[in-house]
Amino acid sequence: MTDKTTRLGRLTLPIERGIDEEVRALVERLGADAVRNSDGTELPEWVDRAFAKVYSTYFPARGDEEWADQSEGERIHQYLSSNAHTAPESGPLSIDVMEGWFQAQFRPDTQCDTSRWWQVIDRTSGEVVDPSQWSVEAVPAKPIVDPVPIVGDLPKNAGSAVVTIHSPEPFHVYTVSFFAVQVWDSTQMYNYLTNDWALEEGRVKERPFDVAFPRTWEHVKDALAIWLKANPQVDVVRFTTFFYHFTLAFDSRGRERYVDWFGYSASVSIPAMEEFEKEYGYALTPEDFVDGGWYNCPFRTPTPVFKDWIDFTSKRVAEKAGELVRKVHEEGREAMMFLGDNWIGMEPYGPYFPSIKMDAVVGSVGSAATCRMISDIPGVRYTEGRFLPYFFPDVFREGGDPLGEANESWRTARRAIVRSPLDRMGYGGYLSLALKFPEFIDRVEEILGEFRSLHEATGGEKPACAPVRVAVLNAWGKLRTWQTHMVAHALWYKQIHTYLGVIEALAGLPFDVRFMSFDEVIEGEMKALEDVDVVINAGAANTSFSGGQVWEDLRLQDALRRFVARGGGFIGVGQPTASVGTQGNADRGGICRGSVFTLSDVLGVDQEISWSLSKDHYEEPVSEHFITADLDGDYIFGEDPGDVVVTDSATRVLVMDRGSVRASAHDFCAGRSVYLAGLTWSTVNSRLLHRAIMWAAHAEDQWESVLSSSNPDVEVAWYPESALAFVYNDADAPRSSEISGQGGQILVELAAGQGRWVDWEKGQLL
């Protein structure tokens, strides 16, 4: 066999026991220089670093069932809300808090001081019910009725609780915010149910434990030291991940009920909350986490309390993760983090992440945006993308389409990789399943060749960007770089696709992009905008992404108006800057701005919410404009954001639909603004945003500065130092395009999904 050092490299392959010859052959064929196990598989005993670089998954806070038995009171906890119940006209109200929740995943913690760590709230009046007015009774868990997946037996320590409100207000609505013990690890539960592990003898339901408890933390450190000594063949410890899982809660039938990839709900514990009170000077309440049942989802503008909790959790997680990483380094190994699962508190763009000294980050690549989320992480030596499909039986089965998913995954991710290359790519799951689909393996081999060429053809040079700097403005800013409008990682949701297309497009466009928070602008005023040419505010009204009430801050309004007036560009998508202020007469102490979009004067349009129907509006669409030059056919913007009308006769209406403005352009003093109703992902919409940014920045004459493609389905990247261009077809069908710029022009014809290099000086395809 060829020595691993002579292989092509940049590939991590999942392997398993029982297919030794197949593993050896495929590693050689694909040029894999690293191998890994996955959740549910083990590395063959013969694999060592002479064969390939060895990754091994490591779970600091689960998988040790012996310790789980010894630390029963030190489980991961999570705040949950009961279903809402309406009180009867007379008599008490009893609420089974686990109604609707998965009895195999959670158990109410009735051993804690429930008067302190539980809350009963009258949701009608907004009042917290005094603990003396209600009582808690622990009751047995109810059996799971009609489960959707195969669950198997309930964990031995499953249970429920009934809260009785003795004298509720008649017909008021009540909820119970309760402290729940997690009796089954979220990731292992997901994999267990997805793969029908209940049918496999010996599979256990793993219980997670919390490093906030000193005894458990000492055990976790000792266990890692022992494991490192016992596994000298492992080169890279792939932490999957560290301590706290994103919010993932199932319903009573074993289906997903609440998923928030950014959720901090499972990072709570009594020791942590007590430490928080000492450090920040105030006590947390259950409602700080339950948040009326919204659980501080990232679409909510984060409260000051929740920001404090994120900061506190990130700081303590970074300190502990850093200790484990130091142990790995002391043994001469590398530390890699999986960006997912138990990643809460490991914010890779947060202030504490660099202190951990992580060598690498690997994450699942579900879109161009999630690819950039990984590849742009600062302070690590290398990044790796785990590509789809995952080698699980939900795809690798009769009737499944792993080849189609591989093509879609590559076309999607390639746009981001071209702009900000991942250092490595890999896959996960059961290799034995993938081997049953030889055409899939053939395609992976082709994808690998193209991926490697993006590193090798230009000697590591990155493609040139257009001379326009873009800032995406929302409540989260840098902390959630490339992470806006996501619920469950890269999954499609009706309410978000209209806006997710903005960062999906930006992830593959030739711009320098940064993410900026409202606070950054408010506190820094114009200084925050000094290095920016175009600001984008995209989102639905009253969300953290559009801004909501934050636009009542005059400092924010003033900074943006000054920025545009002095020549900057502003692009609003959906319901940008939407906030109706405080209703009331300005003479009576209210703020009656008379508009929904706070910056309607800048945008030249506003939203009609039936308050100004008596006003007549005369929209006259223009037939041609730089922004819509490549819009062939209808503008498919996504979900309807509501009626939008012009507020200035100088506003150029680019697209009208059913009497509403869907795209417009407007001059504001020396600057320019653009309004778009939405931007669901498509190559045409990506081109529309590309042109909108260039126009808003007064940079139309720079359109070909980094080469341009006549066909939106075909993109091009320009490498000036190498005098090379890379052209790539984003469509699943053949496409042709004229590539122009830098004094040259060439016609390219590409097969479905194909990428080709061009020697620009010679005008030849390579």
Q: In which residue ranges do the predicted regions lie?
A:
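Noncatalytic N-terminal accessory/assembly modules of large enzymes
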Residues: D3-R62, E66-S94, F102
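A short, well-structured beta->alpha microelement
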Residues: T12-R24, S38-G40, M337-M346, I503-A528
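Extracellular ligand-binding/catalytic regions of CAZymes and related secreted enzymes
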Residues: L248-D251, S432-A464, A507, G594-L613, ...
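Polysaccharide-binding and catalytic clefts of secreted carbohydrate-active enzymes
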Residues: R75-S355, M373
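Catalytic domains of carbohydrate-active enzymes, especially glycoside hydrolases
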Residues: G18-F51, A223-T240, A360-V361, T412-L422, ...
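The substrate-binding groove and active-site-proximal loops of carbohydrate-active enzymes
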Residues: G9-R17, A32-R36, D196-E218, R300-A318, ...
